[in-house]
Amino acid sequence: MKVTTRFAPSPTGYLHIGGVRTALFNYIFAKKHNGTFLVRIEDTDKERSKDQYIDAIMDGLNWIGLNPDNEPIKQSERFNVYKEEAFRLVDAGKAYEDEGAIRLKINKDGSTLVKDLVYGDIEFPNKELDDLVILRSDESPTYHFCNVIDDNYQNVSHIIRGEDHLPNTPKQIQIVNALGYKGFEYIHLPLVLGEDRKRLSKRHAATDLMSYKEEGYLPEAVLNMLAKLGWSNTTEDIFTVEELIKIFEVQDIQKAGAVFDICLLYTSDAADDWSS
């Protein structure tokens, strides 16, 4: 299997430190398997998506050294594709129109199995899934629908993202099956938490990646800090990206939430290691 991963941020704000951790894990997993790392801009939120945020996201990835192997595609430029796929499902009797929107029909019998390489097999009862809106009445696609279509279009093999997306996965598997796609491998990462074990926010520390650049931190230091958020297989403190690629294994990803510790940006021998 050719490994292809993707980092798919929404340009509704600056690049969050938790998102950079997701990008890093996608990058090193792809490179470990001689695969491809993609970036996709999920800008279907017309009101909140801004070009300035797209520029900031790409600048941040460039600064930290996680450059994609593609020219990022924008979902806002693919609305016709999503519309065509939605009506293909309607024509096949797998979706229906509802007050101007289009919903996917969900068989309420049985369950949907999510096979996750970190959290294991998880079954979600289908009776708990609503008939999903896949196209809104204004013909804009919903997140789940265009997400699946683009992952298939870009030949993504492994979806690596935060574990807050686990409840989304059975919905997306239903879409995958309805569209007749091959499907994907899933790797969900533990959430990045503050010291109070609540989801990391600005009250814990700076969450915007470029804030760390402005404060004078080295990108290598930030990468090392992020690598330790939810993954560990060694007592070593300092890694180059090449070393991370070599030693990274999915089975070393932890399930428990990863506590953000600003002190991980400081090590006694960091300057010597990175300047050598």
What are these regions (language model features)?
Residues 266-276:
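Single conserved hydrophobic/aromatic residue that forms the stacking wall/gate
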Residues 75, 88-202, 208, 212, ...:
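Active-site cores that bind ATP or allylic diphosphates and position pyrophosphate for catalysis
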